[in-house]
């Protein structure tokens, strides 16, 4: 999915050439097993990758699991591929598996230009909550809460560590764990009533156009510089590249854009199945195939 010039079809064609040039794969490679940790961006990229693989005669499957369970599944050779290693925020979680030689990170990121940090509605930003250091001043309005995503996520761990270590004076705050959809619903409810809320925001995601919101400055030491600027990498189970070289070549060529992902994520958040959302996007964007 290299989109500026290369395309899905070109990527697929490269894979077809690879299939002719490389020795036949293990029959088990036909069943490519993806992990999805319940994030709409990963559902979108996994959906697009699955559409390409299906067109090449593969039978991709998806397992929904938390991040630790997904990595454990790769360690145990129950999962082959995960398209959502957000670096650097997920590094503490994945590093033990990499050091143990159980997971391989592909060299080229599948997405650049992502970001990942705390955010607030624009009206709250305009009132003065613009920086991590401002959060404590708004404790009463916020109800002493910071809204995160699913339990076990590295983002929640970062927020919890801030609270535990009293970073930015947050020792009296509480992390509210939820799902992506649950957290966004809470943020949207707060927006309709113009209540104060601090929540986890990221891009790519439709929230950036669906809500008037601002990312908080000052969190470089927690989420990373430039509002948690991130690269997203593809990871595979150790040995997968050698066992399934044709699929591996395709995975090495998968690259997405923030705009593309956001367009596919929108329908997914409206309950459209990821593969269907991916197919619809590709049909509506024929230039993708050129």
Label each PLM-derived region with a short phrase.
Residues 102-151:
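A conserved helix-loop-strand patch within extracytoplasmic ligand-binding domains
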Residues 115-125, 229-243:
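A bilobed periplasmic-binding-protein/Venus flytrap-type ligand-binding module shared by bacterial periplasmic
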Residues 26-41, 58-63, 143-147, 251:
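Short, well-ordered beta-strand elements
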Residues 23-33, 53-54, 137-143, 288-290:
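Immediate post-signal peptide segment of exported/extracytoplasmic ligand-binding proteins
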Residues 48-57, 139-173, 280-284:
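Ligand-binding cleft/hinge of the Venus flytrap
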Residues 79-84, 151-220:
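Ligand-binding pocket segment of bilobal, Venus flytrap-like solute-binding proteins
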Residues 111, 254-290:
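C-terminal functional modules
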Residues 46, 63-101, 182-186, 206-212:
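Pocket-flanking alpha-helical
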């Amino acid at each position: 999915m290299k989109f500026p010039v290369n395309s899905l079809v070109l990527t697929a064609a490269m894979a077809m050439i690879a299939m002719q040039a490389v020795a036949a794969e293990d029959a088990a490679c036909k069943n490519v097993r993806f992990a999805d940790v319940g994030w709409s961006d990963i559902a979108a990229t996994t959906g697009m990758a699955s559409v390409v693989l299906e067109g090449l005669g593969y039978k991709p499957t998806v397992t929904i699991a938390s991040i630790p369970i997904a990595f454990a599944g790769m360690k145990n050779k129950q999962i082959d591929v995960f398209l959502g290693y957000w670096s650097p925020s997920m590094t503490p979680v994945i590093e033990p598996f990499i050091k143990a030689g159980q997971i391989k990170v592909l060299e080229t990121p599948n997405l650049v230009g992502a970001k990942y940090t705390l955010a607030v509605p624009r009206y709250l930003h305009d009132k003065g909550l613009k920086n991590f250091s401002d959060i404590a001043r708004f404790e009463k309005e916020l109800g002493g809460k910071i809204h995160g995503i699913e339990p076990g996520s590295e983002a929640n761990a970062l927020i919890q560590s801030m609270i535990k270590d009293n970073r930015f004076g947050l020792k009296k705050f509480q992390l509210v764990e939820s799902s992506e959809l649950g957290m966004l619903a809470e943020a949207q409810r707060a927006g309709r009533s113009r209540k104060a809320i601090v929540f986890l925001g990221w891009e790519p995601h439709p929230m950036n156009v669906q809500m008037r919101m601002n990312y908080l400055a000052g969190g470089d030491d927690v989420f990373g510089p430039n509002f948690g600027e991130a690269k997203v990498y593809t990871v595979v189970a150790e040995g997968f590249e050698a066992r399934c070289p044709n699929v591996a070549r395709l995975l090495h060529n998968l690259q997405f854009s923030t705009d593309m992902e956001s367009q596919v994520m929108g329908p997914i958040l409206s309950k459209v199945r990821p593969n269907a959302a991916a197919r619809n996007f590709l049909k509506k964007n024929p230039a993708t195939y050129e």
